[in-house]
Amino acid sequence: MAPKIAIVYYSMYGHIKKMADAELKGIQEAGGDAKLFQVAETLPQEVLDKMYAPPKDSSVPVLEDPAVLEEFDGILFGIPTRYGNFPAQFKTFWDKTGKQWQQGAFWGKYAGVFVSTGTLGGGQETTAITSMSTLVDHGFIYVPLGYKTAFSMLANLDEVHGGSPWGAGTFSAGDGSRQPSELELNIAQAQGKAFYEAVAKAHQ
C-alpha cells in the first residue's frame, strides 16, 4: 500500500505555499500524492492588514487538531523562519501535540522540512537544525534532501538561491518582495520526489 504523505506549512506572504506546491508536484512525479494543510494563523486580521499580508489559500484546510496527522506515514513541514526557528504560528501548533508526545503517536513517522528566510544568512540551515529538537522529541525519523538527487542544483553558483542538504529553501527578501525562483522550486520538487521515494521504500 502506498504511504500517506502530508505537507504541513505556514505561509504569511505565499512563499512557503509555492514551495509546498512544488513539493507536492515532486511527490506526484514519484507516483504518490499528498494532502496539504496549513497551521492556524495566530495574528489578528488588523495586524495582518498592517503587514500587507495577502489572504490565505482557503482551499487548503487549516490543521486545528494534531491527531489528524496520526494517519500519515510521512510529513513535510514548510517553515518560514523567525530568528532561525519556527514562527509563533507553528509553535502554537506544536504546543497542542502534548497528547501525541505522551502517547508516541508520531514515533517512527518520517519527516522533512523546507524553509524560507528573508536573507542569505537568515537561517536556511539553522531553521532545519532547530526543528530537530521538536521532531526528535516526537520520534520522527528525519529524511534530509541530501545531495544525491539535487547536487547540481544545490551546488549552482550562477545565481543566488536557497536550499541546503537539510531541505529546500527560498529567500523572500526583508520585505517579502522576492518570490521563489525556478531553481528553488525545482529543488523543492526534487525534495518532494526523493522524500516520497524514501518513505515508500521504507514502507514496503
From Swiss-Prot:
GO terms for molecular function: FMN binding; NAD(P)H dehydrogenase (quinone) activity. Gene3D superfamilies: 3.40.50.360. The lineage of its organism: Eukaryota, Fungi, Dikarya, Ascomycota, Pezizomycotina. SUPFAM superfamilies: Flavoproteins. Belongs to the WrbA family. One of its GO terms (cellular component) is membrane. Keywords: Allergen, Cytoplasm. The keyword Cytoplasm applies. Residues 5-195 form the Flavodoxin-like domain. InterPro entries: Flavodoxin/NO_synth, Flavoprotein-like_sf, Flavoprotein_WrbA-like, FMN_Rdtase-like_dom. It is found in: Cytoplasm. Its main location: cytoplasm. This is Minor allergen Alt a 7. Pfam families: FMN_red. It comes from the Eukaryota.
